[in-house]
């Protein structure tokens, strides 16, 4: 093999490696960035025993609503304490302590997955309350298993739900990995209007172009 041939072979190998690396990066970005309502919040935080999780004393027979008053309007969530008691109690307890007040909804997805993600006090997608909630009420792996109006927990893997949650504004199919803990009974149109404005930099996944701040929260138990 001549020096020229060796040079050409080396160049081709370099191109193939670079191309493979680029493809891997692109695929990784798609999987991590758009592959679900995921985050990196508190992945290393301990999964708390049920007895140690915060509670709002909501029983399975109670009706409980969480009202998020945002700068875009009021969003009311009917919780599902019979199906996700640990999650409902933990989030209601956080809400009663004003944990969500003055926090932003930091993520909007607009292609394939249709959610607005909130609940991170840092607004970065990495924040959480310092504990993890066990998974509950996971849906079947079927089409549109997260229908419009669903409220579910974001996570960084099994058993890592903390305080971040997402509001589904259009029927969405996801892996059966996210605890469903409520339904939007009022304000879905607000989320849909926010979604219609898109992402701040024009992509399918990022901060919403219409800024959303949770100004206050109220828990109603009956």
List PLM regions with ranges.
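Cyclophilin-like peptidyl-prolyl cis-trans isomerases
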Residues: 1-222
